[in-house]
Amino acid sequence: MAKKSCEKHKNFNYYCEECQSLNQVSEARFNYSLLKKTRRYKKFLLLIAIIVVVVILLAVFWLWPSWFGNINLQSQLYDSKAGGLDYFDFFFLNFWSTNFLFNKTALIGAFIGSIIMSLPPERNLLTLIGTKLRFGKPSYWKSLIVWWTFGFILFYFLGLLLNANSGGFAWTLYLIENGEIQLSPNLIFDAFNVIFNANNTDYVTVYIYSNLIVPIVSFVFGIIIFRLILNIVKNVYLRRNDYLVIGNILVIIGLLCGLGFVFLPTLSLDGINVIQILGLIFGFFSFISLGVLIYLFGKAQYKKDIKNYIFSRSKQKKIIYVVVITVVFVISPLIISIGPLLNLNNSAVWTEQQWLKKYSREIEWTRACAGLDMFEERPIGNFTESSTTSDALMVSQIRQFDQNFAVQYLAASIGSTFEGLADSDIIYIDNKEYWVAPKTVRFSEITGDAVQTNTELYDHVEGFLAMDTFTGNLVNVTQEFNISENYPIFFGESESQRYLEQTLGYYEEGSLGAYDSDIILGTEWALGIPNNEFRYEGEPDGTLYGLEGFWKTLNIGLFAYAFQTEHQYLIHRNVRSRVENILLPQLRIDNDPYLVFNMNLGKMYYAVSVYTYINVGAYAQYPILRFLGVSLVDVLSGEMTFYKNPTLETSNDPTLPLWEIYLDKYTWQDTNLPANEWLKDQLRYPEDLFELQLEANYIYHVQNSVSWRRADDFHERPEDGDLFYIESDLGDGIEYVGLDLVEYKGLTATLLAGMYVIRHGDHFGEAIFYYTRDSGESLVGPTTARETYRSEATQDISLISGARHGNTLLYPLGGSIYYYVPTYSTAGSLQQLKLAGLVEAFNREVGYGENAQEAYNDLNLTGTVVPSNISLSYNFEMESTMTFPNDPAHFIIELQNLDNNFSAPGLQVKVNLSIYTSTVITNNLNLTYDLILPPYLYPKNFTYVDVPNTVTNFTVVDTPLYFGEGLVLNGFVNTTIGGIIIFYKWTLIVNGAIFYTSPENLISVY
């Protein structure tokens, strides 16, 4: 039967109250008893009950124990092996964190959404659904119930978006709750004051505003806009009304302008932007006001005449005129800003509008946040002028072998198929630099078998490898580090990317590697590898019982052990994840952990650096970067101990309130204590952190408006640039530093802009930038230096099979600065150092030879020659290597009196050979030297101390030479120990005066 309709509608409309009233009496006749559908409802209710029971059972017996078991394990791990850290507090953040489904952050979103949709109850969405399902338009009370039930759940999950800013919302509330920062009633006004007050550096206020106020306002505006969109759909689809549609659209535009205005304190604005932001204010009030007026006008028109809901042509024109006028008013600040914008090429306007109001503030904020006050600037000349190290000693400290060489060489020394190499690192210990690579499990050989990956079968490797960076030889780790050669590593790293690329030919980023899988303890698989001598004897990271242990064991593929009543595990065996999983928000680890050695105790640890990464916004172009310290992970037991950065400054840091909580939540040990001196000497500034600070300083070291405008002092890394750890002399003798070379940004000439150096040891954390901008001569960059070397040694390089150039490094030599460029042969299974070049940075003078010493000799930087009319030719040669004790270093002396005057008196010629090394090595190792000469020669010798060295001086030749007379003498130098580097120089004395002094040279004793 057709339903009746009112006068306004041709057919019955479900949402017209008049249509429904006409059919209420008629519909009563067709009502029938619901008892006919009882059976259907019973089946439906029974199905729902079954589903509910199944869901509850799954939650109780699977979802909860499976999920909470991992949480429980981590809580036990960090409580017992990280100094009692509260993992629940760190993970849940007192239920602010969205890591847990039920949290207070989502609850805030649920209440905000339900309140906004209930004032008054929003019925349009339900009406749209009702149109489709034909249940009609709901009442106000029904709508209210829906929004506080289903709507509450909907907005609860949408409320998780409040924490979408990298967890900043939850973390800010946690900081406020813990009393670390204060929530001021003037917060919004203080945040906007940052824009208009050039002297305002309130980092804390901007941080709170951007992480707390902005998400809430954005969420509120988003829900209001959603509600307005529903109104638009209603007035287009259900009951057309053009006035209400355009009114809602204008209000949405106004809200978007307001939302843009809310974000302003988080942006870096110049003077022109400050003028332009008035457009957002005008737009917010103008469009909302106009939208509301049109909305109310449309309502009034509809009440007068129900057919008056479509724009007539005349009304369309009026609306367009009003909107155009409004738009012109809104963009008027943009029009006004055109004047200053066109005059930015005027230096006064640029200084006023951009330098003072934006760039100088960016520099101030960024330097404070990124910690750029750590950089001291010195002219490049200071690098050579302050060096006190002899050339011979400096040459012996050159890092001849790069990481690529070290990985391949060390990998060839692995003695089993299941072992691989973790990342190789430069380690500085006892004033000596080494390439050190811990062994690791070769995961590609065992992956896919749960017994191999998740039991004690392959739970560790034993030992590590080390190589001398100068000689390229393997070292005895027991002798050099006081660590046994088969020291077990139960907690370590995965195979390094470089190792996998060299051995397998590929690297899959994100794939599981060694130590990434959890293992169960107490199985019969321990000591299943014949070569392994150790099994894990430490405490488990955690123990699970019942269903938690059952599902955890089942999830790692060990069904046979799932039904045990007690399960003990080692988890987070990869040292990176072990430390990373206990970090509070906005902390990061350095991605390059390295080994440190307590030689007194014979213990080995991984050092994992921890630093802050706190985004502030506004004029700070880089986050707050502070090195907090390291977590030492015992490779035997997995115990973690936190050691504080020995030079961390907290007294005058304006950003301290945002990261002081990290100092309180972790149990930091004092690195400056005498008992921890061993660690301080080996501590390394985090590479990732320093590179972030370098990247910031490349730009924000410029604090002069003229240089900034010219952009002639910005820096960038050269091709193949990196942070290289080397030994150098900055004025306090040989020390361990990180070196980063930079060129001027954008210049095709690739000139050296300077070098950044990060210091360690007693000067830990001090950074120096040696600049070239005031140098009278231009210094070539590393790219040009390599090209110069290649050009000079083209013929020799062409003879090297698969020639590869290694890292280009910079050293102070011969009173100047020289680039060191090694060339390796890559043919065959192993690389070999075939050629080495030294390139002077000022005049591009090149010396090259088989190694760094030969390259230095080729430069012919001779010693002192006293002008004389004496006709004497001389030549001194010495081998640069020897093997103790059976292959001493051979030397040859050639002398000839070239005087043609037969009546001239003879020359009294004396040749001294001075051999020396440091007094510490000489005394500790009881080192002495021997000369092997013809039996009729008995060279005189004496030993003396010339700080910091102990020198033994041999008089090898002491004889008269008459006209036409000469001599050739062959001999050998030997020592009483091997594995050291000794230095020597020749002194030729004629008639009691020094005639020639050779450069200092070295002999590598193997």
Question: Predicted regions: what is each one?
Answer:
Residues 10-14, 23:
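Cys/His-rich microdomains that often coordinate metals
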Residues 894-900, 923:
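Asparagine-centered strand-capping/turn motif at beta-strand->loop junctions
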Residues 881-887, 962-963:
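Short, solvent-exposed loop/linker segments at the N-terminal edge
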Residues 887-891, 967:
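Structural beta-strand segments of beta-rich domains
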Residues 24-871:
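Soluble extracytoplasmic regions of secretory-pathway and membrane proteins
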Residues 944-946, 956-959, 965-977:
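Short, hydrophobic beta-strand segments
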